Amino acid sequence: MNRVFVLSPANCNGLRARWMLRKNSRSEIAQRLRGEGVSLGEVFSFLSALYFRGKLAYAQTFAEPPSNCPGILIITPTAGLMPDDTMIRLSKLHGFRRGRIHVKNRHYCSSLRRSARLLATQMGSDCELVLLGSLATGKYLDLLKPIFGSRLRVPQEFIGRGDMSRGGLLLRCVRENRELNYVAAETVTPLPSKSRRNQSHNVSNPTALPPSYDDSVL
């Protein structure tokens, strides 16, 4: 069966993003963002060096898209779904920083729904869409399930795992050429807010974390 992956984004307001977007940043990726541009997948892999990098590597290994359909798309705060190889510059990243991924953000919701409907048509009926992202809230599932129905799948192994654990799992699967088990998203129920708090990272001083800390949105 054909399979397309949709990935949740990296955090565009995290420590690494702020460091990269400084006017005096001399990093190679910051200079390219000011010039010819950088692919969206590479930018988000830099911002989230474990979780997003693991998602992208996994999707690149196991995507089997139908013809004339991208195999990997990334959810963005302001532009709906974008192929991972889309070239972006600083202005686009600044726009992402201003967007909020939340079901009450009408611009985020309308952009995602619009691009998801287009993807659903491109995919056809014999193709699965696998979400690599948070299952704990409705910010992705509530918007995608009505459009894709039974075609929307999620990794069974993601249920109950934190984002750092997922990143390591995905990279191991790539090394072992081992695919995860996918279940229908219709069977997944978002966790209540108390359970989500219990699963969150216990970080008392986030600003003290080193630059390698994984800035992911889940």
Give, region by region, the residue ranges found by the protein language model.
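Peripheral peptide segments
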Residues: 1-218
